[in-house]
């Protein structure tokens, strides 16, 4: 199947996806909002008054869920190198996660406070070459973890997307060194054919 045909096939399936249709009706920016809702319903990640950092936030589905969960009194800082339209209760900072200036901008926005939750739904551009895609996904997740360590308070929570494969062992090992508990989550809203899972790490610095 040619790339053009694969794209058309994916678009047809995407439009028919019940989570895509439901997200449009509910006003969510993306179907990914339901993944976070389902993880939070199971694990109770959020609470009113928390400070949340959302890495790779655009178009904003996860930030929408977090903003609703931490109100009243909470903060959601959404970060992405892509532009994102404003959302109620969400502060957006545009920049590259690997840039020192970007990290300084976030710390300034936090004003000396620490984040209660850092979450990342970032994924690389998929090439279709399994090993290469897994390696890029791992690199993104490790960057997100390194960044989280600079802003998380204790006992903080880190939620990150990963892709199943041998390389994931390195990420799990790093998380287990830094957090008290690490769990795998595959929310119902994740597509069946997708190799994505989420790693939920709790108890940072405990």
Each model region followed by its residue ranges:
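Conserved class I S-adenosyl-L-methionine
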Residues: 48-58
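A short glycine-rich, Lys/Arg-flanked "PGG" loop and its adjoining helix->strand segment in the class I
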Residues: 67, 138-154
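Short glycine-dipeptide loop
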Residues: 72-74, 151-157
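Class I S-adenosyl-L-methionine
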Residues: 165-206
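Glycine/threonine-rich flexible loop motifs
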Residues: 126-137
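Class I SAM-dependent methyltransferase Rossmann-like catalytic core
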Residues: 1-48
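Conserved SAM-binding loop of SAM-dependent methyltransferases across substrates and taxa
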Residues: 59-72
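S-adenosyl-L-methionine
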Residues: 79-127
């Amino acid at each position: 199947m040619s790339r053009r045909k694969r794209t058309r096939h994916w678009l047809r399936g995407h439009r028919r996806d019940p989570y895509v249709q439901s997200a449009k009706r509910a006003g969510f920016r993306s179907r990914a909002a339901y993944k976070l809702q389902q993880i939070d319903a199971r694990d109770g990640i959020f609470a009113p008054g928390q400070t949340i950092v959302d890495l790779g936030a655009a178009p904003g589905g996860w930030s929408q869920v977090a903003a609703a969960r931490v109100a009243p009194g909470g903060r959601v800082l959404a970060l992405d190198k892509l532009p994102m339209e404003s959302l109620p209760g969400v502060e957006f900072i545009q920049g590259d996660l690997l840039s020192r200036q970007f990290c300084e901008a976030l710390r300034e926005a936090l004003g000396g406070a620490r984040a209660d939750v850092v979450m990342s739904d970032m994924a690389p551009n998929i090439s279709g070459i399994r090993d290469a895609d897994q390696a890029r996904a791992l690199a993104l997740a490790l960057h997100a973890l390194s960044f989280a360590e600079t802003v998380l308070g204790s006992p903080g929570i880190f939620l990150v997307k990963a892709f199943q494969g041998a390389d994931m062992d390195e990420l799990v090992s790093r998380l287990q060194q830094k957090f008290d508990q690490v769990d795998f989550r595959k929310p119902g809203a994740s597509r069946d054919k997708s190799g994505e899972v989420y790693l939920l790490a709790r108890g940072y610095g405990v």
